[in-house]
Structures are given as C-alpha cells and as structure tokens.
Amino acid sequence: MLHNPEKVAILYWLHLKEHTDVFTQGYVGVSTRLIDVRFREHCSRFNNSYNQYNPLHLAFAQYGVENIIKTRLCVCSIDQAYRLENIFRPFEYMGWNTAEGGKLSKTAINIIKSKYT
C-alpha cells in the first residue's frame, strides 16, 4: 500500500441502529479526518451526484441520512486501518461498500486517471 505508515487513521462503520454484524452490514471505511467530516463528504456526494448503483447512496435514500449511525471501530496507523478494513470487507459489494477493503473502487481509479492523464 502507498500510505504513510506513521499517519493516524480511524476505521469506522456506518450502519443502522438494528445492524449487529459489522462483517456483513453497513459501510466500513477508513479516514484520516474526524468521522463527522468524512460522513459529511459521503452525504455531499450523495446530494450532488446520486448514484443508483452505489449501495451507500441507496441506503441514504432508503433509510435517510439522519438514521445512519457512525461508529468508530479503531484508531490506529493508516496501514493497520486499511488491513483491518480488508478483514471486514475482503470482497467488492459487501454490505454498503463497493470496493474491497483497503482499495479504491474502479470508479475512483478511473476518475483519478482521467484527471491526471
């Protein structure tokens, strides 16, 4: 991975109140910012570019952003956070995630490539 191993990150879980299984339900992510800041970014993307194929966007639309719970799972090095994320999301499209843990989605990679090529 190409991350600064010294940088601190948060492994977080976005889920509904009734969700009990972090391995199969909700969204697991990594951020080097506060969870509330990262959550606002997710909400902004949802509000500005709704994607009907994005499970997190579908959850926001179906359940309402106000019903999503933000849970901090771990504060650790960024490398450790991505390794843990991969344990919770080893495959694409698990829970509300589109990419396997520790990796960018193909859509994100294509956007980055288009900006720099």
Predicted regions, residues:
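Structure-specific nucleic-acid interaction/processing domains
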Residues: 1-117
